Amino acid sequence: MVQLTQFFASLDWEMISRLLVAALLGGAVGFERERSGKVAGLRTHTLVSLGAALLSVISIKLFQVFPSVNGTVGYDYHLIANIVVGIGFIGAGTILRRDNRIEGTTTAASLWVVSAIGIASGFGFYQEAVATTVVVYVVLAGLWLVEKYLTRDIRYKGRGIFNELKNSEPHKDLSSEK
């Protein structure tokens, strides 16, 4: 029992709260995606935000243990850059082309933003993380109505980039030409 008490006493509750906040905020965005029936929903968004927060917390811990290497400081920034790159690959997996439509770009963008929310939470920037979550939720839950009515003519009358993609000439395989 003493060991368990010592274990809880040694926990870094500030860092744990950062992880919990990231999971909660990522879950809020994921809930909207889940409710909308999107490919990446509650669990995916929660895990992306939590993972980004964990890597941010690890970055802080690494900096505390290894403050500099050859007089260079900046572990924090390298990990953040790699989080963003990694999330780009996950997001790319949600983008699909169906018939003449490209789907999943909003979900890919929401995963990218959720990773930023996780990074902000991991570094303890709660105000920024919460404010961003609120704005993202409003964009996802409310702007689709505006988009639906403002872009109806563009979509259904064949104008815009999607029409350009649909009518563009497929790429030729230059390797087969002699």
Locations of regions flagged by a protein language model:
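C-terminal ends of transmembrane helices
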Residues: G27-V39, I90-E103
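Hydrophobic alpha-helical segments embedded in the membrane of multi-pass proteins
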Residues: N82-G88, A109-V113
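Alpha-helical transmembrane segments of multi-pass membrane proteins
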Residues: G26-V29, A52-I60, G86-T94, V136-W144
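Internal alpha-helical transmembrane segments of multi-pass membrane proteins
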Residues: V73-H78, N82, E103-G104
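Canonical alpha-helical transmembrane segment with a positive-inside/aromatic-interface signature
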Residues: Q127-K178
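Interfacial segments of multi-pass membrane proteins
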Residues: A108-F125
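Alpha-helical transmembrane segments and their membrane-interface boundaries
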Residues: M1-Y77, Y126, E164-K178
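Membrane-water interface at transmembrane helix exits
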Residues: R33-E34, I60-P67, G93, R97, ...
